[in-house]
Protein backbone atom coordinates (compact mmCIF):
# COMPACT_ATOMS: atom_id res chain seq x y z
CA UNK A 1 0.00 0.00 0.00
CA UNK A 2 1.18 3.51 -0.73
CA UNK A 3 1.99 5.59 2.30
CA UNK A 4 -0.19 8.61 2.76
CA UNK A 5 -3.43 9.88 4.21
CA UNK A 6 -6.42 7.62 3.63
CA UNK A 7 -9.63 9.53 2.90
CA UNK A 8 -13.06 8.33 1.87
CA UNK A 9 -15.56 10.06 -0.38
CA UNK A 10 -18.85 9.99 1.52
CA UNK A 11 -21.97 8.29 0.09
CA UNK A 12 -24.24 10.33 2.35
CA UNK A 13 -24.68 14.00 3.18
CA UNK A 14 -22.65 15.97 3.75
CA UNK A 15 -20.95 14.87 0.55
CA UNK A 16 -17.21 15.27 0.06
CA UNK A 17 -13.98 13.70 1.30
CA UNK A 18 -13.51 12.75 4.93
CA UNK A 19 -11.31 10.85 7.30
CA UNK A 20 -12.66 7.34 7.90
CA UNK A 21 -14.62 7.17 11.11
CA UNK A 22 -17.93 6.84 12.83
CA UNK A 23 -19.65 6.38 16.13
CA UNK A 24 -18.58 4.31 19.12
CA UNK A 25 -20.87 1.37 19.84
CA UNK A 26 -22.11 0.82 23.40
CA UNK A 27 -19.44 -1.01 25.41
CA UNK A 28 -16.71 -0.31 22.83
CA UNK A 29 -13.48 1.58 23.51
CA UNK A 30 -12.42 4.49 21.31
CA UNK A 31 -9.51 2.45 19.98
CA UNK A 32 -11.73 -0.54 19.15
CA UNK A 33 -14.19 1.77 17.37
CA UNK A 34 -11.35 3.25 15.29
CA UNK A 35 -10.18 -0.23 14.26
CA UNK A 36 -13.75 -1.34 13.42
CA UNK A 37 -14.62 1.81 11.46
CA UNK A 38 -11.37 1.62 9.49
CA UNK A 39 -12.13 -1.97 8.53
CA UNK A 40 -15.77 -1.16 7.64
CA UNK A 41 -15.00 1.88 5.48
CA UNK A 42 -11.57 1.10 4.01
CA UNK A 43 -11.13 -2.70 4.29
CA UNK A 44 -7.82 -2.01 6.09
CA UNK A 45 -6.63 -3.57 9.32
CA UNK A 46 -5.00 -0.82 11.36
CA UNK A 47 -2.41 -0.95 14.09
CA UNK A 48 -0.03 1.32 15.97
CA UNK A 49 -2.76 3.82 16.92
CA UNK A 50 -1.44 7.17 18.14
CA UNK A 51 -3.71 9.93 19.41
CA UNK A 52 -3.63 13.09 17.29
CA UNK A 53 -6.28 15.02 19.21
CA UNK A 54 -9.90 15.60 20.17
CA UNK A 55 -12.16 17.98 18.25
CA UNK A 56 -15.35 19.28 19.87
CA UNK A 57 -16.38 22.58 18.26
CA UNK A 58 -20.21 22.54 18.33
CA UNK A 59 -20.22 23.83 14.72
CA UNK A 60 -18.01 20.99 13.36
CA UNK A 61 -21.03 18.92 12.23
CA UNK A 62 -24.28 20.62 11.19
CA UNK A 63 -26.30 17.45 11.86
CA UNK A 64 -25.60 17.26 15.61
CA UNK A 65 -22.97 18.09 18.22
CA UNK A 66 -20.26 15.47 17.88
CA UNK A 67 -16.82 15.01 19.36
CA UNK A 68 -14.10 13.30 17.34
CA UNK A 69 -11.12 11.56 18.83
CA UNK A 70 -8.60 11.29 15.99
CA UNK A 71 -5.92 8.63 15.74
CA UNK A 72 -3.00 8.18 13.38
CA UNK A 73 -2.49 4.54 12.43
CA UNK A 74 -0.69 2.17 10.11
CA UNK A 75 -2.90 0.32 7.63
CA UNK A 76 -2.42 -3.24 6.41
CA UNK A 77 -4.14 -4.75 3.40
CA UNK A 78 -5.52 -3.53 0.12
CA UNK A 79 -7.65 -0.42 0.64
CA UNK A 80 -11.08 -0.33 -0.95
CA UNK A 81 -14.17 1.77 -0.34
CA UNK A 82 -16.89 -0.02 1.65
CA UNK A 83 -19.89 0.71 3.90
CA UNK A 84 -20.47 4.51 3.93
CA UNK A 85 -17.63 5.18 1.47
CA UNK A 86 -18.33 5.81 -2.21
CA UNK A 87 -14.62 6.05 -3.09
CA UNK A 88 -11.29 5.85 -1.32
CA UNK A 89 -8.11 7.76 -2.01
CA UNK A 90 -4.61 7.92 -0.59
CA UNK A 91 -3.33 11.48 -0.53
CA UNK A 92 -0.14 13.33 0.24
CA UNK A 93 -0.51 16.20 2.72
CA UNK A 94 0.31 18.69 -0.06
CA UNK A 95 -2.30 17.31 -2.50
CA UNK A 96 -5.51 16.89 -0.50
CA UNK A 97 -8.91 17.14 -2.21
CA UNK A 98 -10.60 20.54 -2.05
CA UNK A 99 -13.94 19.39 -0.70
CA UNK A 100 -13.27 18.12 2.82
CA UNK A 101 -16.21 17.48 5.16
CA UNK A 102 -16.75 18.72 8.66
CA UNK A 103 -13.58 20.15 10.28
CA UNK A 104 -11.30 17.63 8.58
CA UNK A 105 -9.22 20.37 6.91
CA UNK A 106 -8.32 21.59 10.41
CA UNK A 107 -7.55 18.04 11.59
CA UNK A 108 -5.31 17.46 8.56
CA UNK A 109 -3.56 20.80 9.15
CA UNK A 110 -2.88 19.72 12.74
CA UNK A 111 -1.49 16.44 11.41
CA UNK A 112 0.78 18.26 8.94
CA UNK A 113 2.01 20.58 11.70
CA UNK A 114 2.88 17.66 14.01
CA UNK A 115 4.16 14.96 11.67
CA UNK A 116 6.25 14.63 8.55
CA UNK A 117 4.95 12.85 5.44
CA UNK A 118 6.59 9.52 6.31
CA UNK A 119 3.68 8.61 8.62
CA UNK A 120 0.80 6.74 7.01
CA UNK A 121 -2.90 7.21 7.39
CA UNK A 122 -5.21 9.12 9.67
CA UNK A 123 -8.21 7.49 11.31
CA UNK A 124 -10.71 9.07 13.80
Question: How should these model regions be labeled?
Answer:
Residues 111-124:
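Acidic/histidine-enriched, glycine/proline-rich intrinsically disordered or flexible terminal extensions
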Residues 1-19, 46, 50, 75:
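N-terminal strand-loop-strand
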Residues 70-72, 80-114:
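NUDIX/MutT-family hydrolases
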Residues 43-78:
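Active-site segment of metal-dependent pyrophosphate-handling enzymes
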Residues 24, 55, 75-76, 93-96:
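Hydrophobic pocket-lining residues within nucleotide cofactor-binding pockets
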Amino acid sequence: MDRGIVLIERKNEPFGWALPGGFVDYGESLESAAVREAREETSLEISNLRLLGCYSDPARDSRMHTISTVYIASGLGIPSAADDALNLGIFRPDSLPERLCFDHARILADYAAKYSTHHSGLLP
